[in-house]
Amino acid sequence: MLNQIKQDAQTRMTKSIDALRHSLTTVRTGRASPALLDNIKVKAYGTDTPLNQVASISVSEGRSLVISLFDKGMIKDVEKAIYASDLGLTPTVVGTVIRLNLPPLTEERRKELSKSVHGEGEDAKVAIRNIRRDANQQVKDLLKDKQVTEDEARGAEDDIQKLTDKAIKDVDEVVKGKEQELMTV
């Protein structure tokens, strides 16, 4: 029973860290990455469709992205979606492909993005602490129902705290790595 609670807590904490990593892939750094465009939705065939489902996106020359559409009639829709996104990118249509040149980030924009990354890291830490609280509550409920001894409950709470400390350390490392990536010119 206690092992199940600890495993569940660990799984949920790992998912929180993975969600943070995925969320941070959409934060623009100095390098071009197809993941930058993951959140862009295009009006396609009457519905909002993720850009990566209507086009292939590749990196060209380090600082630019090339979008090759599967349906050439959607160029205007994709262009409109890129303008509407909050990435500050200007699409250039070259024949049947769209090029996105990523200008270097200004120092001010880097600091803004760094704050945003830090904030997302804090949100992940809060989620992890909530998971710890839920797990500890489950342990206390078992103790109250006399399904475990006090020593077993205390040991489980210590293990849950160790899991929490490790998860928060992992979040700090992910955030620190992304901030370093942002500050590298």
Swiss-Prot record:
Gene: frr
UniProt entry keywords in alphabetical sequence: Cytoplasm, Protein biosynthesis
Biological role stated in the UniProt entry: Responsible for the release of ribosomes from messenger RNA at the termination of protein biosynthesis. May increase the efficiency of translation by recycling ribosomes from one round of translation to another.
GO cellular component: cytoplasm; cytosol
Organism of provenance: Xanthomonas campestris pv. campestris (strain ATCC 33913 / DSM 3586 / NCPPB 528 / LMG 568 / P 25)
Family: Belongs to the RRF family.
Protein name from the UniProt record: Ribosome-recycling factor
InterPro entries documented for this protein: Ribosome_recyc_fac, Ribosome_recyc_fac_dom, RRF_sf
A GO BP annotation: translation
